[in-house]
Amino acid sequence: MSLKGNARATFLESGDPALKDYYPAWVNNLADDVTVEGSLLDGAVQGPDAVRKVVLGIRSLYERQEFRFAGPCGNNGFLEDYVARVRGEPLGCVVLVTLNAAGKAQHIAANYRPLSSLLLLSRLVREKLAGTPYAEQFAASESSS
């Protein structure tokens, strides 16, 4: 992947070894009306079963995932910053989870980089979720676009 200048993109770096065994507990603590949105899809997906299926579907496509940061953000949020590989391509993601008053994940916003890896992952997620009502919110394969 070519980059201009001497800057090194953070999605090319490794994760924090202290977070090697981290698992996002919020995935199992979703509000009844939870939503997920982000750069991988158009619009949002709502409902705990649908959101869990999307999130776990994305994670299943990773060859590896290393967290750089995971921790509280503000009074009612949680932030994750991680790097991953999808079909050998580097990927970075920042996830902001907003918690409701009961401490359940109410809203998840996930933003991926770089664009080439984002598009690849979005197409793969669409294939993985084929047959669900929200599969078409992800990018179509290159041959059908």
Model feature map: region roles:
Residues 1-145:
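C-terminal and inter-domain tail/linker signature
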